[in-house]
């Protein structure tokens, strides 16, 4: 008997009742989920995430998944004897690294997630920014120690073809987006999944952006465990940004972009927790850190 089956019936009923207002609020809305971290590498978490996406779809909510693949890309680079480097929280992407990223993101990570979701029904469709000109890229640099630094074939999302994405959503599909996109000259760039998720959420007018991480939420004074915040506004978060660990910077920038761009809230949640998406969306307490306009 599973732990859920062992719960008293009245507790199960309370859980369902608590979820009802949130189900009503989100019905018919787009929720963009950035899928990454341990949730991508632990088999139990991967299957739970796929089940969560199918659950949302069957409740009349429209999930759009934007996934990374950092650990898998790093592993493949090592297998091939290619050295990788990071600057300012972003992977330096040479043409050789880009070839590996394309192979891993769309051919491995995206395929695996599509198959897991489709075990629950014919819902998921794997796509990249190259498909139907879903989105285009513009090359970016990063600032490291106050200096603009080139990081190779790494882009920001320039434009999102919302019609192509919404056609899939209207057909009852769950887009699973690998973050590769061409620039105006057709040169393909690797786009940080956090950055891409924010751009997609903003363009689609999503109700929420969820960022799966390997941490409980946002700590204002890491590693002080007492500094975890449950809610923070964009003004305060922007002031905090220069003090954060480099790995958290792209996630926080994504939340700021999405919320300032019109998404009502962005959420940094712990992807190490089974069914973390359902916990965040359908319980009063939620989990992690909620970012709101302010």
From Swiss-Prot:
Its EC number is 2.7.2.8. It comes from the Bacteria. Belongs to the acetylglutamate kinase family. ArgB subfamily. SUPFAM superfamilies: Carbamate kinase-like. Pfam families: AA_kinase. Substrate binds at residues 69-70, 91, 190. The record marks 34, 251 as: Transition state stabilizer. The lineage of its organism: Bacteria, Bacillati, Actinomycetota, Actinomycetes, Mycobacteriales. Its main location: cytoplasm. The keyword Transferase applies. GO terms for molecular function: acetylglutamate kinase activity; ATP binding. It is found in: Cytoplasm. Pathway: Amino-acid biosynthesis; L-arginine biosynthesis; N(2)-acetyl-L-ornithine from L-glutamate: step 2/4. This is Acetylglutamate kinase. It is an enzyme of class 2 (transferase). One of its GO terms (biological process) is arginine biosynthetic process via ornithine. GO terms for cellular component: cytoplasm; peptidoglycan-based cell wall; plasma membrane. PANTHER family: N-ACETYLGLUTAMATE SYNTHASE, N-ACETYLGLUTAMATE SYNTHASE, MITOCHONDRIAL. It catalyses: N-acetyl-L-glutamate + ATP = N-acetyl-L-glutamyl 5-phosphate + ADP. Catalyzes the ATP-dependent phosphorylation of N-acetyl-L-glutamate.
